[in-house]
Regions:
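Short, basic/polar amphipathic helix motif occurring as a linker/hinge flanking DNA-binding modules
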Residues: 121-130
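Conserved small/polar residues in nucleotide/adenosyl-binding loops
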Residues: 131-135
Length: 135
């Protein structure tokens, strides 16, 4: 079962995401102490992180950079900060995708599924071969 860490300070959004993803059989953990995101990350050992940008103490860009020091797992930013500069910063700081709030839970789910599939299920496959194709 895949583990997902939700770093979101809006309790309603965090609870909604957690309940929805649990219905898809994901193990979901929500950070409660925003001074201890890395401790929670080490404890949970997630396969994927959902990261808000505006957080107490340190923003999501900071935590993404800290996670990138120790892991290459997928990080999807989920934020209402929908201007292009925040999207560019999120990806440049190590994020893999960006979803703008408000969002459809089904869109979030398929993005998570695709990210997990590419990261973990296809990881053992050899690179694509084009030798059988003719021009």
């Amino acid at each position: 079962m895949y583990r997902i860490l939700v770093v979101e300070d809006d309790e309603v959004i965090a609870k909604t995401i957690r309940q929805h993803l649990q219905s898809w059989n994901y193990e979901v953990f929500a950070v409660a102490d925003f001074n201890s995101v890395m401790e929670e990350f080490a404890r949970v050992k997630p396969h994927l992180v959902l990261m808000d940008i505006r957080l107490p103490f340190h923003n999501g860009f900071y935590w993404c950079t800290e996670i990138r020091k120790v892991s290459k797992l997928p990080i999807i930013f989920v934020s209402s900060m929908n201007d292009n500069m925040n999207l560019v910063m999120a990806i440049n700081m190590g994020g893999d995708d960006f979803i703008i709030k408000p969002f459809d839970l089904n869109v979030l789910t398929v993005k998570i599924q695709a990210m997990l599939r590419r990261t973990y299920e296809f990881a053992g496959e050899s690179p694509v071969s084009y030798t059988h194709l003719r021009a």
